[in-house]
Swiss-Prot record:
A Pfam family per the record: CTP_transf_like
UniProt key word Coiled coil: no
NCBIfam families: cyt_tran_rel, nicotinate (nicotinamide) nucleotide adenylyltransferase
GO molecular function: ATP binding; nicotinate-nucleotide adenylyltransferase activity
InterPro entries to which the protein is assigned, alphabetical: Cyt_trans-like, NadD/NMNAT, Rossmann-like_a/b/a_fold
Enzyme class: transferase
Stored PANTHER family: NICOTINATE-NUCLEOTIDE ADENYLYLTRANSFERASE-RELATED, PHOSPHOPANTETHEINE ADENYLYLTRANSFERASE
Pathway: Cofactor biosynthesis; NAD(+) biosynthesis; deamido-NAD(+) from nicotinate D-ribonucleotide: step 1/1
EC number: 2.7.7.18
The family this protein is said to belong to: Belongs to the NadD family.
Designated name of the protein: Probable nicotinate-nucleotide adenylyltransferase
Any one GO BP annotation for this protein: NAD biosynthetic process
Length: 196
């Protein structure tokens, strides 16, 4: 089985996350997609509590599954006592599902610093990496794309210019966010009084 992994803070999950999940599922031809909410030790702003973030990501998975099946939430990262690293999550998944192939989904912004990630070479050994880049941005000239493809990295053009940070600011300011979030996620945020 081929499974893709999409991690992030998902604070909150938005239509860009949904579009990326749907595009990745089709372009990568995967049978399953794990959404992994994380505790990013490098994010300055505090995250919504874990219970709400898991619920929001569950709603995102349901939205993805409206057009097919196979999307589920991987809770391993968020259940760790301390922030974890991507290599630890992928090691856990490859040990838990030894016959599966995994593809890690990255945005181009994260890929630019990928060589600084903990044990990034081990990540490349354990799984394929799919980089979704903005079609309007040029590839960083210092990256040898041909060499990276040989190491198991593939590139796809994808543009969804939404930001969870900007959406949180709009919600806190009482500005409308219609069209930025799936309706089920917006409903949950409003019912729970989040991001005020």
């Amino acid at each position: 089985m081929h499974c893709a992994l999409m991690g992030g803070s998902f604070d909150p999950p938005h239509n860009g996350h949904l579009a990326l999940a749907l595009a990745a599922r089709e372009l990568l031809n995967v049978e399953c997609l794990f959404l992994s909410p994380s505790r990013n030790p490098f994010k300055g702003e505090s995250l919504l509590d874990d219970v709400h973030r898991i619920q929001l990501v569950e709603l995102l998975a349901k939205e993805v599954n409206r057009t097919g099946s196979g999307c589920e939430v991987c809770r391993w990262e968020i259940e760790q006592a301390a922030p974890s690293y991507t290599v630890e999550l992928i090691s856990y998944l490859t040990q838990s599902y030894p016959t599966w192939r995994f593809t890690l989904i990255l945005g181009e912004d994260n890929f630019h610093s990928f060589h600084l990630w903990k044990e990034y070479q081990e990540i490349l050994r354990l799984c394929h990496v799919a980089v979704f880049r903005r079609s309007s941005e040029a590839v960083v000239p210092s990256l040898d794309e041909a060499m990276l493809v040989q190491e198991g990295v593939s590139f796809y053009n994808f543009d969804a210019p939404l930001s969870s940070t900007d959406i949180r600011k709009q919600l806190r300011a009482g500005l409308p966010v219609n069209g930025l979030l799936p309706a089920s996620i917006l409903r949950y945020i409003e019912q729970e009084g989040l991001y005020r």
